[in-house]
Protein backbone atom coordinates (compact mmCIF):
# COMPACT_ATOMS: atom_id res chain seq x y z
CA UNK A 1 0.00 0.00 0.00
CA UNK A 2 2.72 2.44 -1.00
CA UNK A 3 1.12 5.71 -2.11
CA UNK A 4 -2.54 4.81 -1.79
CA UNK A 5 -4.70 6.03 1.04
CA UNK A 6 -6.57 3.57 3.25
CA UNK A 7 -9.74 4.55 1.38
CA UNK A 8 -8.18 3.83 -2.00
CA UNK A 9 -6.67 0.58 -0.74
CA UNK A 10 -10.07 -0.51 0.59
CA UNK A 11 -11.57 -0.24 -2.89
CA UNK A 12 -8.62 -2.18 -4.31
CA UNK A 13 -9.14 -4.94 -1.70
CA UNK A 14 -12.87 -5.09 -2.46
CA UNK A 15 -12.02 -5.65 -6.13
CA UNK A 16 -9.68 -8.48 -5.16
CA UNK A 17 -12.57 -10.05 -3.21
CA UNK A 18 -14.68 -10.00 -6.38
CA UNK A 19 -16.86 -7.01 -5.51
CA UNK A 20 -18.21 -5.47 -8.72
CA UNK A 21 -20.94 -3.18 -7.36
CA UNK A 22 -21.18 -0.79 -4.40
CA UNK A 23 -24.25 1.14 -3.27
CA UNK A 24 -24.01 4.44 -1.43
CA UNK A 25 -24.22 8.19 -1.27
CA UNK A 26 -20.95 10.14 -1.26
CA UNK A 27 -20.45 12.38 1.74
CA UNK A 28 -17.81 14.19 3.73
CA UNK A 29 -17.15 11.08 5.85
CA UNK A 30 -16.59 8.76 2.87
CA UNK A 31 -14.86 11.00 0.33
CA UNK A 32 -11.63 8.97 0.47
CA UNK A 33 -13.55 5.81 -0.47
CA UNK A 34 -14.97 7.57 -3.50
CA UNK A 35 -11.52 8.74 -4.59
CA UNK A 36 -10.63 5.06 -4.84
CA UNK A 37 -13.75 4.18 -6.81
CA UNK A 38 -12.82 6.56 -9.62
CA UNK A 39 -9.95 4.36 -10.80
CA UNK A 40 -11.71 1.09 -10.04
CA UNK A 41 -13.79 -1.31 -12.11
CA UNK A 42 -16.40 -1.37 -9.34
CA UNK A 43 -19.77 0.01 -10.43
CA UNK A 44 -21.25 2.55 -8.04
CA UNK A 45 -25.00 2.95 -7.72
CA UNK A 46 -26.31 6.04 -5.93
CA UNK A 47 -29.72 5.70 -4.27
CA UNK A 48 -31.76 8.62 -2.98
CA UNK A 49 -31.39 7.48 0.63
CA UNK A 50 -29.00 5.27 2.61
CA UNK A 51 -31.86 2.94 3.50
CA UNK A 52 -32.24 2.40 -0.23
CA UNK A 53 -28.51 1.60 -0.43
CA UNK A 54 -29.01 -1.06 2.22
CA UNK A 55 -32.00 -2.66 0.54
CA UNK A 56 -30.23 -2.50 -2.83
CA UNK A 57 -27.21 -4.27 -1.32
CA UNK A 58 -29.58 -6.84 0.20
CA UNK A 59 -31.35 -7.41 -3.11
CA UNK A 60 -28.06 -7.59 -4.98
CA UNK A 61 -26.81 -10.28 -2.58
CA UNK A 62 -30.01 -12.31 -2.89
CA UNK A 63 -29.98 -12.12 -6.70
CA UNK A 64 -26.24 -12.60 -7.29
CA UNK A 65 -25.22 -14.86 -4.43
CA UNK A 66 -22.37 -12.43 -3.65
CA UNK A 67 -22.19 -10.09 -0.65
CA UNK A 68 -23.87 -6.74 -1.20
CA UNK A 69 -21.65 -3.78 -0.31
CA UNK A 70 -22.71 -0.31 0.82
CA UNK A 71 -20.78 2.84 1.74
CA UNK A 72 -22.45 5.21 4.23
CA UNK A 73 -21.46 8.28 6.20
CA UNK A 74 -21.42 8.43 9.97
CA UNK A 75 -24.54 9.32 11.95
CA UNK A 76 -27.63 9.53 9.76
CA UNK A 77 -26.04 7.44 7.02
CA UNK A 78 -25.56 4.56 9.42
CA UNK A 79 -28.88 4.97 11.21
CA UNK A 80 -30.67 5.01 7.85
CA UNK A 81 -29.14 1.69 6.75
CA UNK A 82 -29.80 -0.11 10.06
CA UNK A 83 -33.27 -1.35 8.99
CA UNK A 84 -31.81 -3.05 5.92
CA UNK A 85 -28.99 -4.49 8.03
CA UNK A 86 -31.49 -5.90 10.53
CA UNK A 87 -33.47 -7.54 7.73
CA UNK A 88 -30.27 -8.99 6.23
CA UNK A 89 -29.30 -10.36 9.65
CA UNK A 90 -32.67 -12.04 10.19
CA UNK A 91 -32.74 -13.41 6.62
CA UNK A 92 -29.04 -14.48 6.58
CA UNK A 93 -28.10 -12.22 3.67
CA UNK A 94 -24.39 -11.36 3.28
CA UNK A 95 -23.95 -7.58 3.36
CA UNK A 96 -20.84 -5.50 4.00
CA UNK A 97 -21.50 -2.00 5.29
CA UNK A 98 -18.50 0.32 5.28
CA UNK A 99 -19.12 3.52 7.17
CA UNK A 100 -17.07 6.56 7.82
CA UNK A 101 -16.86 7.91 11.34
CA UNK A 102 -15.39 11.10 12.77
CA UNK A 103 -11.67 11.46 13.52
CA UNK A 104 -10.28 8.74 15.76
CA UNK A 105 -9.17 11.21 18.46
CA UNK A 106 -12.77 12.39 18.90
CA UNK A 107 -14.55 9.03 19.18
CA UNK A 108 -16.58 8.47 22.33
CA UNK A 109 -16.05 12.03 23.59
CA UNK A 110 -19.48 13.41 22.61
CA UNK A 111 -17.99 16.66 21.31
CA UNK A 112 -20.82 17.42 18.90
CA UNK A 113 -18.95 16.83 15.65
CA UNK A 114 -20.92 16.64 12.40
CA UNK A 115 -23.28 13.64 12.49
CA UNK A 116 -21.60 12.26 15.62
CA UNK A 117 -23.29 9.30 17.29
CA UNK A 118 -22.40 8.53 20.92
CA UNK A 119 -21.76 4.84 20.13
CA UNK A 120 -21.93 4.14 16.41
CA UNK A 121 -20.24 0.76 16.75
CA UNK A 122 -22.64 -0.33 19.50
CA UNK A 123 -25.59 0.59 17.31
CA UNK A 124 -24.22 -1.33 14.33
CA UNK A 125 -23.35 -4.39 16.43
CA UNK A 126 -27.03 -4.95 17.22
CA UNK A 127 -27.91 -5.25 13.53
CA UNK A 128 -24.82 -7.09 12.30
CA UNK A 129 -22.82 -10.25 12.87
CA UNK A 130 -19.97 -8.06 14.04
CA UNK A 131 -18.69 -4.50 13.79
CA UNK A 132 -15.07 -3.42 13.75
CA UNK A 133 -13.34 -0.07 13.69
CA UNK A 134 -10.09 0.39 11.77
CA UNK A 135 -7.56 2.51 13.68
CA UNK A 136 -4.43 1.66 11.66
CA UNK A 137 -3.90 1.01 7.94
CA UNK A 138 -2.59 -2.49 8.63
CA UNK A 139 -5.92 -3.47 10.27
CA UNK A 140 -7.89 -3.01 7.06
CA UNK A 141 -6.91 -6.09 5.06
CA UNK A 142 -7.37 -8.55 7.96
CA UNK A 143 -10.80 -7.06 8.69
CA UNK A 144 -11.92 -7.48 5.08
CA UNK A 145 -10.46 -10.99 4.93
CA UNK A 146 -12.37 -11.87 8.11
CA UNK A 147 -15.59 -10.48 6.64
CA UNK A 148 -15.38 -12.40 3.37
CA UNK A 149 -14.24 -15.57 5.16
CA UNK A 150 -17.26 -15.32 7.47
CA UNK A 151 -19.58 -14.75 4.51
CA UNK A 152 -18.28 -17.99 2.98
CA UNK A 153 -17.98 -20.20 6.07
CA UNK A 154 -20.60 -19.09 8.60
CA UNK A 155 -24.26 -18.23 8.59
CA UNK A 156 -24.29 -15.08 6.42
CA UNK A 157 -25.49 -11.70 7.55
CA UNK A 158 -24.38 -8.08 7.60
CA UNK A 159 -20.90 -7.09 8.73
CA UNK A 160 -20.00 -3.51 9.57
CA UNK A 161 -16.56 -1.94 9.24
CA UNK A 162 -16.09 1.69 10.17
CA UNK A 163 -13.10 3.83 9.33
CA UNK A 164 -12.41 7.22 10.93
CA UNK A 165 -11.92 10.05 8.45
CA UNK A 166 -8.32 10.65 9.57
CA UNK A 167 -7.47 6.95 9.12
CA UNK A 168 -9.03 6.89 5.61
CA UNK A 169 -6.46 9.48 4.53
CA UNK A 170 -3.43 7.61 5.85
CA UNK A 171 -1.00 5.85 3.51
Labelled PLM ranges:
Residues 1-171:
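N-terminal alpha/beta PP-like core and its mobile active-site loop of ThDP/TPP-dependent enzymes
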Amino acid sequence: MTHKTVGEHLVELLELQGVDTVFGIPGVHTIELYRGLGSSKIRHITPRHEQGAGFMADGYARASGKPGVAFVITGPGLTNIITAMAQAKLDSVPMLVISGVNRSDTLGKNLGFLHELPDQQGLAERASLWSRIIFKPEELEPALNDAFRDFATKRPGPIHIQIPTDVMKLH
